[in-house]
Each structure stands twice: as structure tokens, then as C-alpha cells.
Amino acid sequence: MLQRSVFFLSDRTGITAETLGHSLLTQFDGIEWKKHYASFLDSAAKVQEIIDRINTIAKQEGQPSLVFSTLLDPVILASVRQADCYLIDFFESCLGVLETALQQSPVRIPGRSHILGQDASYFRRIAAIQYALNSDDGSNSKILADADVILVGVSRSGKTPVCVYLALQYGVLAANYPFTPEDMGVVRLPSLLQPLREKLFGLTLSTSRLQAVRVERYPGSHYASFVECQRELQWQNELYQQFNIPFIDTTGVSIEEISASIINRMRLERRLYGT
């Protein structure tokens, strides 16, 4: 398999460069990426160190490295341009277009999107994360009614990580409720969920995937058997159909896609960054 080195450079956290860069790299198959990260490049010494590293690796591999950048300082950026690399700078390519459209020069302040408490977004995120943790697995029924969305599904179907992601990325108040064997039998909504039906969104997955997840945690148990996983999923999916609960099959789907689908289908408000 072809190998290529790729660098993610930033004068702050590097989250933007990493996220956008990874999204672009997924469009190219058959390449093993050797990833290098450098954040908080805020001095000439740090920048020179990473430039030397880029040049050394390029010489070793006999080809320029790829560099994804969100560097804002034009002097630092100019230095990186001299390295033996293909530079993809997200801010520089976008800021020029925005400057023309808005007829205003950018302030070029690194880390401005991460300034603590600069607006209500920070506090919304913290509150949403705290809510997701407090309401995990239906542990606090008194606050379920406060949810923007309540994820339902059998045990180990991935509800908790999706709730936390919805809170972290969108500021959504996401609770979750696990269907247990005690709920199963007659296909009906648990009494706690009946008045909250409009907030429910279901997660499902393949029997083999659910079994694999459960076996990791409880190997050899009845809980992790194929027959039990199949039985629980069949009951759950019949419930979704009977009560018209929207749901998504999460088998092989990323948490980002699952969350975006929930936001879209439930028409939830994005509470962060003014979106």
C-alpha cells in the first residue's frame, strides 16, 4: 500500500485543520497516511522545528509531504510555504473570498473561536454535556421531559456516545433510555416514555454487530448470545414500527452521520456558534 506523510499545523488547538484534513483524505483510497500533528505554533523556534521535520521526512520518503494548515500569522505561513511540501491552508484560501465579499479585512487573531466564554455557546455546551451525563440510561426520570430528544434502543446500541456528541457538537439536550428485558413482552411503550413520544428517536443495528459489542463486555453470557440479541432487536424494531418512532440503523455508520441525521430528522435547533 502506498504511504504518504501528512502534517496538521495550527497556531492553536489544531482541531479545525485535523477535522477538515481528515475529511478530505477519506476521499482517497489505497493510501496509508503517516500523520504528524503540531499545534500552538506561536514562535519562530517552534515553526522552524516543524519545518525541519517536514523537510527531513520529505527527503527520507523522496517526495514532498502534505501539510494541512490553519495558521493565521502571515509570517509563519510564509515560512511554512518554503518547506518541501504541498500546503493546503484552509484559512488563507477562505479568508480572501470572505474579505472580498464582506469588504472587510480579517482580524487574524488565533484561537478566537475557542475563547472561553466569548458568548453563550460555551455555557450551552457545558450544560448540554452535564445533562447528557445526568440523564444517561434513564437514570434521572425527573429531567427526561427537559430533553430536546430522547434516544431509545436496546442495551449497548450506542445511545450514550451519540448523546454526548450531540451535546458537545450542537449543544442539544439529549437523554437516552435503554429497553430492558423487563420492558419486553407485549409491544408497548414503557409508561415513562408514553407522554414523551414526540421526543423519541430510535437506534438499531444488526444482530451480529450487537452481539459483537456485548461479547466484548460480557463474553459467554446469555445477554451476549445471538439468540438474545436477535430477540431484543426484533421486539425493539416492532415497537418503532407500531408507534411510528423515527430510527436509524447505525451499523457501519459514523457517530457524526448518526448525529447529523438525528438533528435533521427531528428538526432540532443547533445551539452552538449561533447556528
UniProtKB/Swiss-Prot annotation:
Q: Which residues form a coiled coil?
A: none
Q: Which GO terms describe its molecular function?
A: ADP binding; ATP binding; phosphotransferase activity, phosphate group as acceptor; protein serine/threonine kinase activity
Residues engaged in binding ADP: G153, V154, S155, R156, S157, G158, K159, T160
Instruction: Name the InterPro entries for this protein.
Output: Kinase-pyrophosphorylase (IPR005177), PSRP (IPR026530)
Answer whether the UniProt record assigns the keyword DNA-binding to this protein: no
Known catalysed reaction(s)? [pyruvate, water dikinase] + ADP = [pyruvate, water dikinase]-phosphate + AMP + H(+); [pyruvate, water dikinase]-phosphate + phosphate + H(+) = [pyruvate, water dikinase] + diphosphate
Q: Which UniProt keywords apply?
A: Kinase, Nucleotide-binding, Serine/threonine-protein kinase, Transferase
Query: Which superkingdom does the taxonomy of this entry point to?
Result: Bacteria
What broad class of enzyme is this? transferase
Q: Which EC number applies?
A: 2.7.11.33, 2.7.4.28
| One Pfam family this sequence matches | Kinase-PPPase
Q: Can you tell me which family this protein belongs to?
A: Belongs to the pyruvate, phosphate/water dikinase regulatory protein family. PSRP subfamily.
Enumerate the HAMAP family for this protein: PSRP (MF_01062)
This chain's function reads: Bifunctional serine/threonine kinase and phosphorylase involved in the regulation of the phosphoenolpyruvate synthase (PEPS) by catalyzing its phosphorylation/dephosphorylation.
Q: Which NCBIfam families match?
A: PRK05339.1
Output this protein's name. Putative phosphoenolpyruvate synthase regulatory protein
Protein's organism: Nitrosomonas eutropha (strain DSM 101675 / C91 / Nm57)
